[in-house]
Amino acid sequence: MALLAQQLPRRFNSVKLTSFIKAKQVTKRSARAGKAVLPGFSAQPLLSSDTSFLRRGIKTYRTLFWNRFHSASTNRTKSSAESTLLPSVAEQQERILSLESELPLEEVDDLPPLSPLQSVSEEEAIQIAAYSPLPISSFTLADYVDHSKTLQKLVQLGVDLSKIEKHPDAANLLLRLDFEKHIKQILLFLKDLGLEDNQLGPFLTKNYAIFSEDLENLKTRVAYLQSKNFSKTDIARMVKNAPFLLSFSVERLDNRLGFFQKELELNVKKTRDLVVRLPRLLTGSLEPVKENMKVYHLELGFKHNEIQHMVIKIPKMLTANKRKLTEIFDYVHNVMNIPHHIIVKFPQLFNTRVFKIKERHLFLAYLGRAQYDPAKPNYVSLDKFVSFPDKIFCKEIAKASLNDFEKFLKTL
C-alpha cells in the first residue's frame, strides 16, 4: 500500500494536462479582456456550454492518466500481489476511478507545472478532444455558430446572419433563443400560413423580431385579416411581400385599411385588392402617400376620380418618388403633348424610367411616327410604348431595326 501511495503522485504529475491548463488560463484572460472590448453582443447565454467543454477536457485527461497508470503498474502488481498485502489490480482501478470522480475543477490550478518535452503516445493523442473557446463578446454571429444549434438551424433555413448581426439587440435575441422552445412553433405557424421552405430564410432575415412576438397575438392578427375576407392565398402573399405585416397590432392594421378606403374613396373589395397587390401600404409610412396625393391633385392637375383610377391600376404610384413623378408628367404632358385623359388610361407611364421615355419618343419623332392620339392614323399605344423590349419596340412600333435605334442613341 505504501508503494502505491508513493507511485500515485508521481504518475499523476506525469499526466499531460498542459493543453487543458492553457485553455483554462485563456478563458480567464478572455474574461478580463472582455471588459476592454468595444460594445458588441455578449455570449452570456452560451457560457454554460463553455464550462461543459472545460469539464470534458478534465475527463479526457483523467482517462489518459488512468490508461497510463494502469499499463505501467499492472506488470509490477502481478509479481508482488501474492507475497504482499497490496490490493489487486481491480481494487487499484476502482480507487483510481474514485479519485477521478472526486477531483474538483478548482484543484486544477494547484497542479504542478509539467514538462513541455513530455511525450504523448499516439493512442493518447487520438483521445485528446480540443474545443475552441467561446468568445465572451463579439461583433459577428459567425463566432457563435459552432456553439449554437439555434444559429446552425437558422443558417440551414437560409437566414442571412450577416444582416442580422448589424443590429446588436437582434443578435443578442437569437443567442438567447432555444430552437425547439421558441423558434420551431413560429416556423410551423408561418408554414401553416402558406410560406414555402425557400421563403422562410428571406422572411426571417427581414423580420427577425417575430421571434419575440407572442404566438397567440400572431394568430389573432391573421384571424382579423380573415374576418376582412382576405383569403389564405392573399394573406400568404401579403406576409411574403411585407414581412413586418404580422408585427402590427390589430388596431393599427384596421386604421391603415380605413385610411386608404377613406382617402381614395374605395369600396371594401377595391381596398382589399389594393393592399394585396402592395401590402407595404399597411406597413410603411403614410407621409409619402399623403404627399403624392397632393402632388397628383394640386401640381399635376388630376381630378380625384382620375387619381383613384390610376392608383387602382398601379398601386406603386402612391409611394413613388415625388421628383420622378413630376419629371415624367412634365415630359409626357408638355413635350409629347399627351393630355390628362390619355395619361389616366396609361398610368404605367409613371412606373417607367424617364430616360427610356425620352429615348423612344425622340426616335419615333426622328422617324415621323410620334403619334399618340388614338383618333388619328398610325396611333402608337402608350402601353406598348413603355412595355415592349427594345427589339420588339423597333420592329412593331418604330418599323426599324435595333441597330438603327442603337446608332440613333449614340447621337443623343
Curated annotation (Swiss-Prot):
Pfam family, one: mTERF
Organelle transit peptide residues: 1-67
Location, primary (coarse class): mitochondrion
Keyword terms: DNA-binding, Mitochondrion, Ribosome biogenesis, Transcription, Transcription regulation, Transit peptide
SMART domains: Mterf
Transmembrane region(s): none
Gene Ontology BP annotations: negative regulation of DNA-templated transcription; ribosome biogenesis
Disruption phenotype: Embryonic lethality, due to severe mitochondrial dysfunction. Embryos are much smaller than normal and none survive past 10.5 dpc.
GO cellular component: cytosol; mitochondrial matrix; mitochondrion
Molecular function GO labels: transcription cis-regulatory region binding
Subcellular compartments: Mitochondrion
Family of the protein in this entry: Belongs to the mTERF family.
Function (record text): Binds promoter DNA and regulates initiation of transcription. Required for normal mitochondrial transcription and translation, and for normal assembly of mitochondrial respiratory complexes. Required for normal mitochondrial function. Maintains 16S rRNA levels and functions in mitochondrial ribosome assembly by regulating the biogenesis of the 39S ribosomal subunit.
Domain comment, as recorded: Contains seven structural repeats of about 35 residues, where each repeat contains three helices. The repeats form a superhelical structure with a solenoid shape.
Designated name of the protein: Transcription termination factor 3, mitochondrial
